[in-house]
């Protein structure tokens, strides 16, 4: 109960997330992905309101991608490269999810794709779909099924599981 689940998009957000975790009065998990990121020391730390997401607009959005961790920047960069208008959401909190932003996103009446490079079951897409269970909205989900993934390079495993950014953009083309 009251467990906060989060995953920062970069080193700066990670430092602020840990600062937020120590300041909160709740059990708090900060997930981090395989691989590494460049360290960028914060000169000062700021609290991130628990359960809030942030939006990034690329061009004139025709679709929404909800993702987290380093994939936020990967999707933004790939959208710019492909000249695709997207609203990219940094879903830095899985629990609680940002219900206010979800309602605002639904009002935009754009196709929504949840892009997670982790197991879908019990992940962000599950939390969003659970929240939207009584609504008639179309959400597309890319993620790893409920099975063991063998060892390998991050790139080869993402291709194998259908969760590379190339796979994401193939999926987006189907809905665009």
Residue ranges of model-derived segments:
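Conserved thiamine diphosphate
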Residues: 1-23, 171
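Thiamine diphosphate
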Residues: 23-176
